[in-house]
């Protein structure tokens, strides 16, 4: 009988319906309810992208397809997928409890975020390992980052190339690629967090692979807190690149995310497009990885490499 390995797929989570927004936001705010104005602002953003984010559906599809792919690629062990979310059910702890109940003794934990940071990956894996420690007889093997995975870089190289190939030579000369990820509080830099460096590396790999000479790194979706967040913000960067260098075609690659969701559909497709419209420039944004076969193959490689290194 094949050994069963847990596949713990972790992600941020998103409201399933409009009624979930308040409790979801309250969880993000560590139990503090948002003000009516804050709640109205967030609800308005969801309504602007069609009422609710497609993220919940995409995340589940990614996780299910990954489980299937891993069991197709090898016959040595049987992977059982468990989905654990940071801010809405099924919570990370729920997933770990389900694994324990099913008699899983070893699990590979994959966060659907390519870059490592203490705020994201470390906190997800930490929560999973803490719960496993309480239950006993369950070891969680966490994957720190996978932004260097060849198939991940290749996905974005192909996506960016696809857009540039549709441009005339004259347009290409005045086009710029903005590679971005979710901003985090600036204090992580002083603590030696590798997150900003990893995004810079990712941008270099993609620009080189796609043969794009003009590119810049930006940050997006910063939180509304008194602390400073990492910049430049993608909207400010867009204006600056237009004013300084006269770029009038902007290609946004939000590589810190793996699916179409609020931060991409609103912060990029709405807010950044408002800026490009304002300055009379063209807006482009490649399709996100979502549950594409190429991306699922990338994640499967990541999991199999981790399994080889720890078991």
UniProtKB/Swiss-Prot annotation:
One of its GO terms (biological process) is heme biosynthetic process. Pathway: Porphyrin-containing compound metabolism; protoheme biosynthesis. It comes from Bacillus mycoides (strain KBAB4) (Bacillus weihenstephanensis). CDD domains: Ferrochelatase_C (cd00419), Ferrochelatase_N (cd03411). Fe(2+) binds at residues 182, 263. NCBIfam families: hemH, PRK12435.1. The keyword Transcription does not apply. This is Coproporphyrin III ferrochelatase. Keywords: Cytoplasm, Heme biosynthesis, Iron, Lyase, Metal-binding, Porphyrin biosynthesis. The lineage of its organism: Bacteria, Bacillati, Bacillota, Bacilli, Bacillales. It comes from the Bacteria. InterPro entries: Ferrochelatase, Ferrochelatase_AS, Ferrochelatase_C, Ferrochelatase_N. The gene is cpfC. It catalyses: Fe-coproporphyrin III + 2 H(+) = coproporphyrin III + Fe(2+). Involved in coproporphyrin-dependent heme b biosynthesis. Catalyzes the insertion of ferrous iron into coproporphyrin III to form Fe-coproporphyrin III. Its EC number is 4.99.1.9. Belongs to the ferrochelatase family. It holds the Pfam family Ferrochelatase. Disulfide bonds: none annotated. It is found in: Cytoplasm. The keyword Ribonucleoprotein does not apply. PANTHER family: FERROCHELATASE, FERROCHELATASE, MITOCHONDRIAL. Fe-coproporphyrin III binds at residues 12, 29, 45-46, 53, 124. One of its GO terms (molecular function) is ferrochelatase activity. GO terms for cellular component: cytoplasm.
């Amino acid at each position: 009988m094949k050994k069963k390995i847990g596949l713990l797929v972790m992600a941020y989570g998103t409201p399933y319906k409009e009624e979930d927004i308040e409790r979801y936001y309250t969880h993000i705010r560590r139990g503090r309810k948002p003000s009516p104005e804050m709640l109205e602002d967030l609800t308005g953003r969801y309504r602007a992208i069609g009422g609710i984010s497609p993220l919940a559906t995409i995340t589940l599809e990614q996780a299910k397809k990954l489980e299937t792919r891993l069991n197709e690629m090898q016959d040595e062990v049987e992977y059982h997928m468990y989905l654990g979310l940071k801010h809405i059910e099924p919570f990370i702890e729920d997933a770990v409890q389900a694994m324990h109940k099913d008699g899983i003794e070893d699990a590979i934990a994959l966060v659907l975020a390519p870059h490592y940071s203490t705020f994201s990956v470390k906190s997800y894996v930490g929560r999973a390992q803490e719960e496993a420690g309480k239950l006993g007889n369950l070891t969680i093997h966490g994957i720190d980052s996978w932004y260097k995975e060849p198939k991940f870089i290749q996905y974005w190289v192909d996506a960016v190339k696809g857009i540039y190939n549709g441009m005339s030579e004259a347009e290409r000369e005045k086009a710029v690629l903005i590679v971005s990820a979710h901003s985090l509080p600036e204090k992580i830099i002083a603590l030696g967090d590798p997150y900003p460096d990893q995004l810079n590396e990712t941008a270099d790999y993609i620009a080189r692979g796609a043969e794009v000479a003009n590119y810049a790194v930006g940050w997006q979706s910063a939180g509304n807190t008194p602390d400073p967040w990492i910049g430049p913000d993608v909207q400010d960067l867009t204006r600056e690149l237009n004013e300084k260098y006269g770029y009038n075609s902007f290609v946004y690659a939000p590589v810190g995310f793996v699916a179409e969701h609020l931060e991409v559909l609103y912060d990029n497709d709405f807010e950044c497009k408002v800026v490009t419209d304002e300055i009379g420039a063209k807006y482009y944004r490649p399709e996100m990885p979502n549950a594409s076969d190429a991306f699922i193959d990338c994640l499967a490689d990541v999991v199999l490499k981790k399994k080889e290194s720890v078991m």
